[in-house]
Curated annotation (Swiss-Prot):
Protein family according to the UniProt entry: Belongs to the purine/pyrimidine phosphoribosyltransferase family.
Record GO biological process: adenine salvage; AMP salvage; purine ribonucleoside salvage
GO cellular component assignments: cytoplasm
Stored Gene3D superfamilies: 3.40.50.2020
Known EC number: 2.4.2.7
Taxonomic lineage of the native organism: Bacteria, Bacillati, Mycoplasmatota, Mycoplasmoidales, Metamycoplasmataceae
InterPro entries in UniProt: Ade_phspho_trans, PRibTrfase_dom, PRTase-like, UPRTase/APRTase
Keyword Ribonucleoprotein on entry: no
Name of this chain's protein: Adenine phosphoribosyltransferase
Native source organism of the sequence: Mycoplasma mobile (strain ATCC 43663 / 163K / NCTC 11711)
Keywords, sorted A to Z: Cytoplasm, Glycosyltransferase, Purine salvage, Transferase
Coiled coil: none
Function: Catalyzes a salvage reaction resulting in the formation of AMP, that is energically less costly than de novo synthesis.
Subunit structure: Homodimer.
Length: 171
């Protein structure tokens, strides 16, 4: 696939979901097509070959992050909502559109000095990604890239992220 914009036909707009006034980008058709999903994994992998660790935020970041990490034979580390990870974790509180949220990561899975890439489905306001970057920084590592299937440019989330931002698709 030479033109990545062809991927857009596998992403459906769902009006008024999850609440009235929102147009949700449903990636289910893309994930349900093995060949198309493989193309996305390969394209994302091209962008992060040189990093040491790949992380993905709860929940759709797990899909892309784990697939790309496996493809590249690199470690994958989950970022989860508070209280969902065992063992020693560190936490960060961050602002959501409608309140506050908390994210956690396990302390021992990323080492100081490692380069890290965040992979996720969509870059919207940038709040989750910014918080994820801060969590990695607390561990002494550095997020060098944030790679997304799609970016909602009108929300300006890219401006909040202190790393190279790469989006396969832009809306």
């Amino acid at each position: 696939m030479n033109d990545l914009n062809e991927l857009k036909k596998y992403i459906q707009d769902v009006k008024d979901f999850p609440i009235k006034g929102i147009v949700f980008k449903d990636i289910s058709p893309l994930l349900a097509n093995g060949e198309i999903f493989r193309i996305v994994v390969e394209k994302m992998a091209e962008k992060v070959r040189e990093v040491d660790v790949i992380i993905g935020p709860d929940a759709r970041g797990f899909i892309f992050g784990a697939a790309v990490a496996s493809y590249l034979k690199k470690p994958f580390v989950m970022i989860r909502k508070e209280g969902k990870l065992p063992h020693n974790t560190i936490k960060i509180d961050y602002k959501l559109e409608y309140g506050m949220g908390s994210l956690e990561i396990q302390k021992d899975l990323i080492k100081p000095g490692q380069s890290v890439a965040i992979l996720d489905d969509v870059l919207a306001t940038g709040g989750t990604t910014k918080a994820s970057v801060e969590l990695v920084k607390k561990l002494g590592a550095k997020v060098t890239k944030a790679v997304f299937l799609m970016e909602l440019e009108f929300l300006n989330g890219k401006e909040k992220i202190n790393a190279e931002v790469i989006s396969l698709l832009k809306y």
